Each structure stands twice: as C-alpha cells, then as structure tokens.
Amino acid sequence: MPSICPKSAMISLPTVLQSIFAFEVAPQIRNSSVRSLNRSSLRHRLRSTRTITTVSIDSIPVPSAQKPDDRVTSPSEPSLTADKSTASDTSSSNPASKATSADNSGSARRTKTNTKTSNEKQASDHENKKNIKKSAKETTASNAPKPPKEKEPWQIQKEALKRKFPTGWAPPKKLSPDAMEGIRHLHHIAPDQFTTPVLAEEFKVSPEAIRRILKSKWRPSGEELEERRKRWEKRHDRIWSHLSELGLRPKVPDYGSDADAVLYKRKSKGV
C-alpha cells in the first residue's frame, strides 16, 4: 500500500483555488483600486477618497505563508499620501496666495492713485479749457464792432447843419426895411445903372437876395411899418449896447444917406 505524503494531504481544491486567486486575481484588484484612488484624489482630494469603496484584502482567505503583505500597500496609504500632498499643496500655496494678495493690494493702490491723478488732470484740463474759452469770448467781444447808438434829435440836427453848411454857419446879412426900400428906389430910378450885381456889391449881400427883394410885390401897411420900425430899433439898441460893452462899436451905418450919396455922386459924375 503506497504511502501518503503529508504535504499532498494538505493540498485540496479549496486551498488551490485560494492560492490561485491570491496570486493572479487579487493583485489586479489591488492595482485597479490604487489607480482609481489616485485619480479620485487628484480630482476630489479628500472627499472623493472617502466615497470610493474597495475590496479589502484581509477578507480574502490567503495562507499565512503566501500573504503578500510586503508587496501591496493597504488602501489607507493612498488617503494618507493624498492628505500629505494636499497639506503640502496648501502650505506651499499659502505664501503664493499671500504674495498674490499683496500684489493685488499694491496694484489696487496704484490704480486708485492713477485714477485720482487722472481725475485731477481732467479737472485741471477742463478748467484750462473754460479759461481759454472765456478769454477768447472777451477778446472777441472787445474786438467786435459795437452797434451804433441811437442818436439824439439835437445830434441829427447838428449833422444836418454840417452837411448843409460845410464851411460853417454864416447867416446872411439882414437888411433893414429902410435899406430894402432904398434898393427898390435906386433900381426903379436907374435900372440900367443899379443892376443886381451892383446893388449886391454896394449893400454887401448876395445877388439872390437883391433879386428876391426886387421881385417881391408885397408892401406892408402903415401899422406893419410902425411895428417893424419899433422892432428894428430894439434890435439896434441891443446889438450896439453889446458891442459898446466889448469895445467893438463901429461907426453908425446910415443906409439912406449911403444910398443918396451913391445916387447923387454918380449923377454928378454923369453930368
């Protein structure tokens, strides 16, 4: 009767299946679980690692001699590694975040300063433009021709007199009623001798005045002659008194005697 090996007696179908599962199927499960844990830790860090469920190796019945404790790490190790990586990332990101916040605050201050200076510059430019426009308006108003003022009635009359008498106003010499009667008398006696130019030269008046005196047919009545005589006497006294005050009183003119002297003198020359 053949002898039975004690080693072979220990081999059975369950043990063979367990050993095959431990060496072939279990490593694949462990590798796939590790990959999923690494991916989830990169995406969701700590939160995702808690939600992932993996198959525990301890639940698989593996012989004590063939249990690969040294080859594959436990599922808790990736979470610890992820915690360490997140802590290191947080610790490394803190100085960077502080530097970024400092840069942001500095840039904000510079932006505020630049905005303030730009606002002040715009205000000063606006003020300068207003001053330039104001000075330009004042210059234009000063250089613009002023509208003519409405003239007073006396100014209009003065200009009309200047146009009428460019060399100055010199009223014509007024002849007394006696002088006008003497002119008419001389022209009536000797019209060929006492022509209009001759009479104008003798009485120092214009030829037009002599012509109008000779042409006039109007004769005053007795009352009008008396009134005219009185008026001329008053005028004579007023003028001569004023001239005597100034010391400029000339000789008393006598138009009647002058007319008689001229008439009889020329008659005597003619005889």
From Swiss-Prot:
Pfam family membership, one: Neugrin
Basic and acidic residues: compositionally biased ranges: 118-130
Biased composition (Low complexity): 79-99
GO CC term, one of those recorded: mitochondrion
Targeting presequence: 1-59
Subcellular location: Mitochondrion
Biased composition (Polar residues): 100-117
Principal subcellular localisation of the protein: mitochondrion
Keyword line: Mitochondrion, Transit peptide
Origin: domain of life: Eukaryota
InterPro entries: NGRN/Rrg9
Disordered: region residues: 57-177
The family this protein is said to belong to: Belongs to the RRG9 family.
Free-text function comment from the UniProt entry: Required for respiratory activity and maintenance and expression of the mitochondrial genome.
Protein name: Required for respiratory growth protein 9, mitochondrial
Organism: Emericella nidulans (strain FGSC A4 / ATCC 38163 / CBS 112.46 / NRRL 194 / M139) (Aspergillus nidulans)
Gene that produces this protein: rrg9
